[in-house]
Amino acid sequence: MSPQWMPQNIQKRLLLYVLQQLSLFSEIDLPNLEEVSLNNIVLKNVSIDPDKVGKLPGCNLRYGQVGSLELNGGVMGGVSIDANNVEIVIAPDFDMKEEISNNVQFSLAQSTADLANTLMVDKSSNEYESSDDETDTVMPSVSSKSRSNSSSSGTSARTRPSALSGVMTKAVEMALSRLQVKVTNLNIKIVSESTDLVLKVDEALLNTINGTRHVKIKGVKLITLKPEVNPGESSDDSPEQESPKESENSNTSDDDEDNDNDYGDESLMNSMVFTHDEASSIYMSATSQSFNKPSNNDDTAPTETAPDNKESPILLHIDDIDIEFEGLSNITNLEIDVGEIKVAAVPITPTIISIFNNISHNLKLKYYQQRKSNIHKQRFKSNLSFPQYADDNDEIEDENEQMPILDDNGASSGPFFDKLRIHNIIVSATSALLPTGQFASASNSLNFIFHNLNIKYKNEALIYGGIEVFKIVKITNDQEIEVLKFNNSTAPTNTEPNPSDEPAGSTSAPSNSSKADIRFEAFTKLDNEIKHLEFTSLFSKQAFVNLDKSVLLLLSNFGISVSSIYDSYNTMRSTMNSVNSFKANTNINGEPRDASSIGVAKESNLQIILQTASTTINIKLSDNLNLKAVIYPISFNLLKQGMSINKILISTVSSGIETLISTLSNIQLSTKSQEFKSFSNKSGYSKGSNDSFPRETILGSNLTLSLSKISSKASLKELKLLIGDFADFASSWQLLSLQVNSLKNSVKDKGFVMSSKSNKNESSSMLSNSMYFNQRRSRRSNFNNPSLVNTNRSNLVSFRLYVDHIEFCITNVLPKLGDFDFQLEKVSFYKLNNDIQGSIHTVKVDRNLGNGEAVNDFIYEFQRKRCNKINIPLILVNIKSNDKANTIDISLRNFLIEYYTRWLELLEKEIDENAVLHDITGQKRESSSLNSPSKRLDIRFSLYDCVIGLNPGRLDCKSLLIINKGNSDVTFGLHQFYIKSSLRNLSLLIIDDVKNINLSKTDREAASKPTSTAYISPLSWFTSIGYISVGNINCIHLGITVNTGIQEIIERNEKLGLQDNLALLDIKINSDEHQLDLCADSAHVLIQMINDLKPPLSFTDEEKIKVTVNDPINLLDEIGQNVFLNESIMKSASHSETFENSTISRKNSDANDINIVEEYYDGSHTSSQSLENGFNKLSISESDNAKDDASSFSFDEEHFSSNGADRNNTEVFPIKMNINLSKTKIYLYDGFDWKGTRKTIKGAVKRVEAQALQELERVKEHGSRKHLKRNMQVTFDEPESNATEDNYGNDQENDDGNSSDNQSLIGETLFQSIHLSVPKGSNPSSLTKNINKSVQNYFDNEDSNDSSINYNVETGRNYKNLKLRRSKNHKISIDLKNIEVNMAILTTRDPRRDKDVPDVKYEVTNSIDLRIEDIDIYDNIPNSTWNKFLSYMNSLGEREIGTSMLKASITNVRPNPELCSTEAMIDISILPIRLHVDQDALDFFIRFFDFKDKRFELPIDEIIYIQMFKMSSIKLKLDYKPKKIDYSGIRSGKVSEFVNFFILDGSELSLPKLTLYGILGMPMLGAELTKTWAPNIQQTQLSGLLAGLSPFRSIVNIGGGFKDLVAVPIKEYRKDGRLMRSLQKGTSKFAKTTGYELLNLGAKLASGTQVVLEQSEQVFGGEGSSARSPKNKNDKHGKIEDDDNEDIYTSGNTSKGNSNLLASSQLLNKTIAVDNDPYGKKKLYSYIELDESDDIDDKILENSLLLMNPKDIKESRQLQVVSEESELQELDEKEELDDEDAIKLVSLYSNQPENTQQGLKLAYKSLGENFEITKKAVNNLRKELNASSNVQESLKSMVKSSPILIIRPMIGTTEALSKALMGISNEIDSNHIIESKDKYRYDASEK
């Protein structure tokens, strides 16, 4: 203790010396000492020297200054230290030579002791021994505490003992016990590259009371300067508005202080007394000043202005901290009491992220620098010539001592603290913090409140504590609303876990903690050098959570922020671990350490246990609906790596009524690594059916959330309400999404990186580099560090969700519709990289009526397999997200979706379509305005083997549409969204009755087997169980556009100049190739099913007509005088012979005028007679000058079209559809597809044959066979004319016993198209033969002379051999090209629901435009030689581009908008048509389309009323070839049967244009057309018909040539006046016409002669026409390739292929040659002339002297040559599948030569072939003569061969002549070649 009388100057010098020896302050000189005395020392503006402070753990001191430092008192009286305006600037630094984790996580006690050691130890030389003695005396007492827990205590400097050391130590301890330190206005600035923080402390006080040291800290604030962040919300009335003035005042005062500091610094620099201990301090001081210069530009200290700036956000505020402890060297009884901590979450989130990212970045830089340095050292060390030094040994030893690998687990002297208490922790998710510590925002703020946090440190093994109250509060208008709270009642104790061996109660908190909301404890135990740490947290009270839109959004943003912080922390932690691992495995030279020098890290186990009570969450979706979730207790166990929840109950609360809608059972969250099977679609596909299978892979997941079952049930009303509220919730969510606490809005700095993805990428690249580095080192040291290996597993997913079973039931969909049950099994979703992928193994949706009725399947796997039998998921999902769009890929496989018409009927009664459409468009428009145009949503669907089931409403049939492969893209735009689909390989299947599905037991077993066997496609599966394929489509492209922003699109189109009509729903369908394969019964079922796929349309009388009127009507006002004419006059007028009398004229009236007569609506639906008398009139364009008829009604055809044209420019259509079909082929087959049809026919055949047998027995008994004198023929054709319409599908027996010729038939009419008849007394077995011949072209060659006849009735076998299945080849094919359908629905208003009637006179509902570019119908009947049945008249030349063969326009209007009924206006135009009608083809058409089955009859819907029907003029050119004559029809009055007596060739008809009015239904339309055109044809078209008669056709054409000889020159002369040229043209036309006709006539005669000769040769046993078959042409040697073929074409007792006159009388059926098709199908060709001249030849042949069986004469008149193919006679009906191939008859006029040269070549070829046949016959005759044993046999051989030797050369001559004449005639007029190719069937073998 110095005496008081010491002069002040000496005291200053002494104190200056002492302060300089502290090695803490720099540049302390006399000017810094304001007042110095032994009891009071005041220092001002003292700077702290960073060099003298030294290296701080983990950071470097950059700047330090104390504004004012005052020391009061002495050693005996206590010391008081007051420091004011202390400013410290530090920068974090991580040295690679130190353990980074220890530097980051160093303890507070260790850092405090090191700082004290730095301040009090004198490191200078022993210049002053007294000072050293005093310092050494004080050192042990101060540093013992700091060094007690250090692992490097041996490195501390040892002090020399002193005699006064004990006394001084006791004195110092007494002085320190009286020490009082007070620090005010402490500012600590932490600077780094990306983050600057300021820690402000208003006041810190240290004093000692009764041996207990008290530390009180007040006003702690943490402020961020960089990055620039959002401080949070602030209220307008908050005190922050007054802060600018205060900040200005404070800045002013700070500026004054800064000026003083600057002045003091200048005087200090210029002082002569200024001294330095070391020269290096000048450099460090200069460095310090240069570091501060950028901050001193504003004349302030570097840390003074930033904290006071209003733009600097405050991160947290602590009002006070009280710390109590005892002792100095050993601190005991440490208790920490913290008052209130307030945290602003908005600015602190990006700040923490920035800190973590900055640490990671600096660590990487240090790592790269160290690695580069190590590589450099290794290079020098590897060079042997370079001198080696041992100076590094000390560093290595130092490194080994200062870099411990193992943690120090030695027992400490005591716990770090005894008790920690924090009164309140308030975290605001939105509000900013004011400098006063209050939150700035008092409204719409969300606060997390932790009240009374207590933590007690019982011993080194146990820490426990709790949070008394934890709640989340929302502050709105100064009112607190509890978001989260815990129940204050007694919590259940059964949920408390028992994590350790000790009872939980023994280690629990005191009694007050038992009331805490949250309790926790941490237990540490060391067992066999393994450290066990158990942390247990218990939420023992029931929690209640109340959420609304704003709160949920704030919590969501807060959760995203916390997640981002966690990601950044993980990145930093992984970087630190990698760097520490690198340091631990390499020494200072960069070499890998030896294994012996590396300590083995002791293992540690961490156990975390979490247990909660039940939690109730209430979400307010709207004012009327809340969503409530009850979560059962949650259990989490880290060692078991899982969290479990027994159950979660979700319910809705509406009007106080709670309804359970969903239950989640057995929720498990596992962090254990698990492998699972996943499926993903392949990137590319090749052609084939099995290449679309997904790729199966095995993935692993470290985080899996699994649920055993999700069960939900809700009514449709509740679901609608829930979905509607969710939609409103989502839309308002988007509006509220830009909250202040969102991570995006919390940062103002645009360059700030919020995500840690880039850091992760950098870290991964660093790890890869380190791996490469260590691999290089391991080659030398044979050491590899596994922690540095980059295990980038591409098959490891970050998260997986798995649900084993999901059940969802929608109840009370409609009163009659029932419930819908949804079942999903094995639902799996996982996140791989940035994609979310998933699969649903099985999906099944059923409709359940709930009253015990059958369940209707809606969606299911098409084979109905169980889930465990399905190996491939039905649904695959892949969700991709990028900066531009979110894409969802959904793959659907093996689905069957059922369509039920009955459901539409039920829905139609409940749903208002207009309201739905309006709601949809309104919602879309509203939602589209919310969508951001920068990021769109795309949904892509892929379909593989999916099926659509079509179930009609009233029929038992069913159809399936199978989609082999397809894809669909759904794109959402700003004003519209698009659906683009492409479907490939579509198949249409149908079955007549679902009861006929043959799913046998074996099929069920096959369906239940695992799919490891061969994959079964839906087409194969359904055809195997009874369905038949009736059509297929190659490809369909579907585009749907839904326009939601109509007004915006209209404005855009106006700017672009587009005039296209708009529609709310625009549909476009483009399809490539289509094919239909139909029989008569399957076609009938298909048509009826299509009609039944729509709900039946029916109206009541009140809906159709106006029953009552408002005003009285005078019925006589609109009726003319001519109406009341005599009925007989009206009848005579309607049936007048003159065509003009059947027309009515149309007056010119106003286009906008229409007269509606009420009586018309009253009687239009009840009486067809009134329509016939009033409206069924005709207006033909040819009678333009016709006078007015008796009727005074006038019609304007352009009335509706003229008014409707203006609407398109202003009105938007609800729906517009465009359909384009490129190619469509329809194949019509004979036979029947349905088993029921075949069974009915077989039964009818059996009954007819039974009746015929009885009649035959009766005739035999009476011995009368007079009625068999004529040739009788059984028929299988259309019904007779006397069959009534009431017999549709009914078995009808037609007995004509009253015929004039006394000839009666036994027969039945089936399906209105099949007539079975057998003449009484004839052979009944011939009926089966005739049926087989008609259907399959099959003819059983039995010997007619066989006396034994097997009847079907007796044996019961032959009728089973009926060939009634579908024929192998089609009979007719229809080829349609470029079908275009444009449909526009102008209104969807239903007058029954929408009573808002538009103010218009009429209403146009829809319009349909149909165009077909080409229509070709091909004749493929085996008995016909013609090619095209119908086609365009190509002889007129090529038509214009864009013209269509058929155009039809249909417009439906509502004459009265108040009524539902509509009327149609039809306009049809057809191009000229060319017809080649063969009677067999015509009969097939009639039989095909007249087929009616009573099983598929439908009630008549609302009959269409045709208001106006227009038909353009039609030009026809007809060729007709009759085959048979129905004499019974002639006798019954069928006048049209006389047409079959004539052959027509080129008959021309011109049907005039007509207009019909008031037609009720299509049947009446056909009758009216016939009624109108028939008189015109009879009166004006007979000349064109008669000109086409075959015998007169050539004469007429030659006469036309003579006419051209005169008419053409006159016409040409009138045109140009050139006489010679006109005569030349006329002569040329005459010569061309006449020459062609003469040559054509010669060719016909030659061909006819050839036919007669071939038939004659065949009668005598020759080959006949079969010699021209392809088989005989190719088989030159006459060998039979297959021995079985010989048996096929021989019969009875004959052993050779040919029969002669003596052997059999059936000569026309024995010599058919077989052609083996190269593709494996047997085709039989027979060339025979069936043209115009054939009938003459047939008559000549009929009257020939050749002996023929009279019964076969009529069969030969049909000129059919058929083949026989043997079949196994099996009772099973499946033998019909192997039906016979049809004989292809080819005309002699086919393959005509185009010129003379080709004609001569074909003639020469024909002569050579026929002479070759003659040569073979001569050779055979020579062999037979040589082989004959007597003259009789030789004569017999000569008689048999002579006719053939004579006729065959004649056949060759006639054939050659016809070919030559055809070539010459076609060269004269080449236009006939086109008609020839269209008319005659083409044969490729001729070329």
UniProtKB/Swiss-Prot annotation:
Record GO cellular component, one term: endoplasmic reticulum membrane
Topology of the protein relative to the lipid bilayer: Peripheral membrane protein
Catalytic reactions on record: a 1,2-diacyl-sn-glycero-3-phosphocholine(in) = a 1,2-diacyl-sn-glycero-3-phosphocholine(out); a 1,2-diacyl-sn-glycero-3-phospho-L-serine(in) = a 1,2-diacyl-sn-glycero-3-phospho-L-serine(out); a 1,2-diacyl-sn-glycero-3-phosphoethanolamine(in) = a 1,2-diacyl-sn-glycero-3-phosphoethanolamine(out)
GO biological process: autophagosome assembly; autophagy of mitochondrion; glycophagy; lipid transport; piecemeal microautophagy of the nucleus; protein transport; reticulophagy
Compositional bias segments (type: Acidic residues): 253-265
Key word Repressor present: no
Subcellular location: Preautophagosomal structure membrane; Endoplasmic reticulum membrane
Biased composition (Polar residues): 288-303, 487-498, 1281-1291
Biased composition annotated in UniProt, kind: Low complexity: 141-162
Residue spans of biased composition, Basic and acidic residues class: 1188-1200
Keywords: Autophagy, Endoplasmic reticulum, Lipid transport, Membrane, Protein transport, Transport
Domain of life: Eukaryota
Residue spans crossing the bilayer: none
Keyword RNA-binding: no
Region Disordered: start-end pairs: 125-164, 227-267, 288-310, 487-513, 1188-1209, 1260-1304, 1659-1696
Family matches, as PANTHER family: AUTOPHAGY-RELATED 2, ISOFORM A
Family listed: Belongs to the ATG2 family.
Protein name, UniProt field: Autophagy-related protein 2
